[in-house]
A protein has these predicted regions:
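Exposed, interaction-prone extracellular/peripheral surfaces
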Residues: 2-45, 61-66, 71, 75, ...
Length: 310
């Protein structure tokens, strides 16, 4: 799948701000006030935060078992029926989404480009964050100057984020083929947009991240919460046997052979992705693998899990 072969309206290649805006309904599906108090704790189990929180959330009818201390006097006096006020945690979450649109991300063999999948996942996460009262910012890595938006809250912030993603992606597709610039400087830029204790979520295949990337990422993890969305194309995980032509940004061309793999043998690329995530997890940087072919419906529960630990 090549970026130049598709019409401008093909969603597999071209990001639409309207489509990313539409993901807000998918992102918020099934989210209730009870689930908005999930705590991000280490390990695979998500639990509720203790206590009732400090921020007013909603007023509802009294039900058996409710604490009488939470009775809302105004609503009760107005209706003559007992009402209670619910609360949620006061969390000022500032999250910067870092989208990798460098030339290596403009690749895909099923459903969409890796860059499109990265943007879809980040948009889903962004809608969840602002829906819970958090603030979302953006940094986009490409072959040209990066895009940066400071964290802000509400639908207006996500309108800016989705528009910036679509615009930056269109610029990336229009750029001539080039080598990937390193991601090191983009980490520094993202850090400058966040307060200490903020959250950075990076969506990338991490091809050619730069010689100083791992060291800098580990260093930043001491003051920020960092999460990785490792984007993976099906062809990388399981290549059918055969000969595959390739072309490099510097003009060199050639052919690579993919040998037949035993049916029970795990795909090396899949192992490499999982091992890479495990290595980052040992340094306190948790992450997940995002399969490009799965699509936003499958990404939504993944982003729900990721949101719970931010």
């Amino acid at each position: 799948m090549t970026a130049t072969a598709a019409p401008e309206t093909n969603p597999a290649f071209h990001l639409s701000g309207e489509a990313l805006m539409g993901l807000r309904h998918l992102a918020r599906r099934g989210v209730t006030p009870a689930t908005r108090t999930l705590a991000g704790l280490p390990g695979g189990i998500v639990t509720k935060r203790r206590g009732r929180g400090s921020e007013p959330d909603d007023v509802r009818l009294w039900s058996e078992g409710d604490d009488r201390r939470h009775i809302d006097r105004n609503a009760t006096a107005r209706t003559g029926i007992l009402h209670v006020r619910t609360h949620h945690d006061e969390r000022d979450r500032a999250v910067v989404l870092l989208a990798d649109f460098r030339p290596s991300m403009l690749f895909g063999t099923r459903r969409a480009l890796r860059s499109v999948a990265a943007a879809e996942a980040l948009a889903l996460l962004g809608w969840r964050v602002v829906g819970d009262g958090g603030r979302v910012g953006l940094v986009v890595a490409g072959a040209d100057e990066p895009t940066a938006l400071r964290p802000a809250g509400g639908e207006r912030a996500m309108t800016a984020v989705t528009g910036a993603l679509a615009s930056a992606h269109a610029r990336a597709l229009a750029q001539p083929a080039a080598a990937d610039p390193p991601l090191d400087a983009l980490l520094t830029l993202a850090r400058s947009l966040l307060p200490s204790g903020g959250h950075l979520v990076l969506a990338s295949a991490l091809d050619s991240p730069g010689p100083d990337f791992d060291r800098l990422l580990t260093l930043l993890a001491e003051s920020l919460s960092i999460r990785l969305i490792l984007v993976s194309d099906a062809f990388e995980r399981s290549r059918p046997p055969g000969f595959y032509p390739f072309a490099l940004p510097d003009g060199r061309r050639g052919t690579v052979q993919s040998a037949r793999q035993a049916a029970r043998e795990p795909a090396p690329a899949r192992l490499a992705a999982d091992e890479r995530l495990a290595d980052y997890a040992r340094r306190g940087i948790a992450g997940l693998r995002l399969d490009v072919e799965a699509g936003p419906e499958a990404y939504a529960p993944l982003m729900e899990r990721l949101d719970a630990v931010l």
